[in-house]
Regions:
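Structural and coupling elements of P-loop NTPases
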Residues: 1-327
C-alpha cells in the first residue's frame, strides 16, 4: 500500500492508508499505520476508525521500540489485539523468546486484565502463509485463512449506529487535480450519498455547509465511486472543500459533533528559512519565504503532528523527531 517516493526510498510507511476486502459474507476495513514513533500522529488520527489491531512482530527481532508506542495507543482506546509473529522461516527465529517478550510488553501496557488474553498466530507474510499453531514444516501448504478467521471471530464489529442522521469524523485528507480535496473517515451513524446537504463542524460548532458531490470507497488498492455508503464504511467524500482533520461532517438536518482527535505535543523543533547564501536563487525549488510558507501550509493540512510558527523571514517547525522533520 506504500506508494510515496520517500516510502519506497526509505522502506517505511509514512502516511496511514486504508482499504477494504471481502471475506465470505464480511467486509473487512484495513488501516495500514506507520510503525515508527516519529509518525505517531498518523497512528493517533486513524486508530479511532479501528475496532481491533493486528500486532505484527518479527520472529527474530521481536518487539521493537515503535511496537510499544503503537500497542500502547491501541490498548488505551480499548482495541482488541491479535498478535501475528511473522517471518517464522528465518534461520535465526526465536519464537518462544519473542512470545515471552510480548507477554512482558502486554503486562506493562494493558489497561485492564482482559487485554492480557490475546490470540497468537504465526505467519510468513511474503508467501501468504499463516497458522494457528507453530508448523512443524513451514514448506507445507497454507494460506491466510486463519488470520481472516481471527479478524471475524476475535475482533468486534464496528460500534456504529446504522439508523439516524449521517455523521463522520474526518481523519485524513487527500488531493488530486481532478476531484480536489477528499475528506476521509469512517461513518459513525447513518448513510451518505451524492447530493446530501451536510454541515461542517469545528470544535463542536457549525462552521459551514456543503453538498456531497461524490462518495468513494476503498477496495484492494483502488478507490471506487459508490452510490451510497453506510455506517461502518470508510469513505472519501468530495464536495467539503473546507474540511480539516478532526472536523465532523454531519447531516444538515441534525448537526451533531463527534469527539475530536487528540494529538500529543511535538518533541523537537528546527528553524527553516530561505537561502541567504551566495547561491540563492540558483538551486532548490522553494527558495523564498513565501514559497516555503505556502508549502508548509499545505503540509499542515494533512500532517496533524506538525506545528509551524512564523519567525521573522523563516519558520520554526516542530514535530515528533528527526525522521518526521526530515520527511
Amino acid at each position: 500500500m506504500d506508494s510515496g517516493d520517500q516510502e519506497h526510498e526509505r522502506g517505511i510507511t509514512i502516511p496511514a492508508k486504508q482499504t477494504s476486502i471481502f471475506y465470505g459474507d464480511y467486509k473487512i476495513n484495513i488501516i495500514d499505520t506507520p510503525g515508527h514513533a516519529d509518525f505517531s500522529g498518523e497512528v493517533e488520527r486513524t486508530l479511532n476508525m479501528a475496532d481491533g489491531v493486528l500486532l505484527i512482530v518479527d520472529a527474530q527481532e521481536g518487539p521493537m521500540p515503535q511496537t510499544k508506542f503503537v500497542l500502547a495507543k491501541a490498548l488505551e482506546l480499548g482495541l482488541k489485539p491479535v498478535v501475528i509473529i511473522n517471518k517464522i522461516d528465518k534461520p535465526a527465529r526465536r519464537i518462544a523468546e519473542v512470545e515471552d517478550e510480548l507477554s512482558d510488553l502486554f503486562l506493562e501496557l494493558a489497561t485492564d486484565d482482559s487485554q492480557l488474553q490475546y490470540p497468537i498466530y504465526y505467519a510468513i507474510g511474503r508467501d501468504g502463509k499463516s497458522w494457528k499453531e507453530i508448523p512443524a514444516n513451514t514448506d507445507e501448504d497454507a494460506d491466510l485463512t486463519p488470520i481472516f478467521d481471527a479478524i471475524i471471530n476475535d475482533i468486534p464489529a464496528p460500534d456504529v449506529m446504522e439508523d439516524g442522521a449521517f455523521q463522520l469524523l474526518v481523519t485524513s485528507l487527500q488531493y488530486d487535480t481532478f476531484q480536489g480535496k477528499y475528506a476521509i473517515g469512517r461513518i459513525a451513524r447513518g448513510s451518505v450519498k451524492r447530493g446530501l446537504q451536510v454541515s461542517l463542524m469545528k470544535n463542536g460548532e457549525v462552521a459551514g455547509s456543503a453538498r456531497i458531490e461524490k462518495v468513494f470507497g476503498y477496495r484492494g488498492l483502488n478507490r471506487e465511486e459508490l452510490d451510497e455508503a453506510f455506517a461502518g464504511d470508510i469513505v472519501a467524500l468530495v464536495g467539503v472543500a473546507d474540511a480539516h482533520i478532526g472536523d465532523t461532517i454531519a447531516d444538515k438536518e441534525q448537526p451533531e459533533a463527534l469527539p475530536t482527535i487528540d494529538i500529543e505535543a511535538p518533541t523537537l523543533s528546527m528553524y527553516l528559512g530561505p537561502n541567504t547564501s551566495t547561491m540563492k536563487g540558483r538551486e532548490g525549488e522553494f527558495t523564498t519565504s513565501r514559497k516555503i510558507g505556502d508549502r508548509l501550509k499545505r503540509e499542515l493540512e494533512t500532517n496533524v503532528a506538525l506545528r509551524v510558527e512564523e519567525n521573522g523571514i523563516g519558520f520554526t517547525i516542530s514535530g515528533r523527531g528527526e525522521l518526521h522533520l526530515s520527511v
